[in-house]
Amino acid sequence: MLLYIFFLMYTTRSRDMSTLQSNMFKFYNAPHSGMYPTFWVGHLKTMIKICVKRSDVINFNKPLDKEMLEMMYGSLLGDASAEKRKGGKGTRMLFYQEGSHNEYLLFLHRLIANLGYCNTNIPKLQTRISNNGKIRKIIKFSTWTYDQFNEMHKNWYINGKKVLPNDIDQFLSPLALAIWIMDDGGKMGKGLKLATNNFTLNEVKQLMAMLDVKYNIKSTMHKTGAMDQYNMYMLSDSMPILVKKIKPYIVPSMKYKLGNYM
């Protein structure tokens, strides 16, 4: 009986995954003009060059453009990570989202693929068993390995632990802020929560001060319940200011995080 129940769970999950993957493919290949803010449409054009292996790539020696760096910094403030390759000289970026946010990750993948920094194969939903035994759907992809990413890894990591880099102010643009919120923000009452629990208390305070000075966005800290972990909460009075700055970059599937302010 137990085996039969497991079989039913597996076949149901397989059908669900197949349906989700089919819907993702339709979304990925849909025309994006009119669907996304004008800023992104040029970046989300149909692939001109299909890159599925390293020999297809032509930008390994080019400097990173400012928009790419801002997107990387915004992503690293959230769930993204930079990985120094073992036995190699370069670094790659890894992007991860829960399956419920697959549209955002597909958007990010298509964007970065069109900029020439990752494989153009469409990411696939995967299943994982969490520590409490629940089945989770996740979706992820990584960039190619670049020497140009080494400086970013050096700035963001000390002894393998993510830290807030000294040059964060230089790259915390409205674009980076939008990417950070889409990646790791969450609606909380009339404000917005950012999961900053991976950063130290002083780093969270630094981010709060930076947003205040740079954009006049006020925020507070909330303890997460775990020792020495804090989340940021952007106050409702600052939400109109925030939305005005980031609205040109927010994709449709992430508008819900900003509630009625969008």
From Swiss-Prot:
Biological role: This protein is responsible for splicing and maturation of cytochrome b mRNA. Specifically, it may be responsible for the splicing specificity of the second intron.
Key words of the record: Hydrolase, Mitochondrion, mRNA processing, mRNA splicing, Nuclease
InterPro entries xrefs: Homing_endonucl, LAGLIDADG_dom
Family that this chain belongs to: Belongs to the LAGLIDADG endonuclease family.
Subcellular location: Mitochondrion
Matching Gene3D superfamilies: Homing endonucleases
Example GO biological process: RNA splicing
CC terms in the record's Gene Ontology section: mitochondrion
A GO term for molecular function: endonuclease activity
Protein's name in the database: Cytochrome b mRNA maturase bI2
Main location: mitochondrion
Coiled coil, from the record: none
Note from the entry: Encoded within intron 2 of COB.
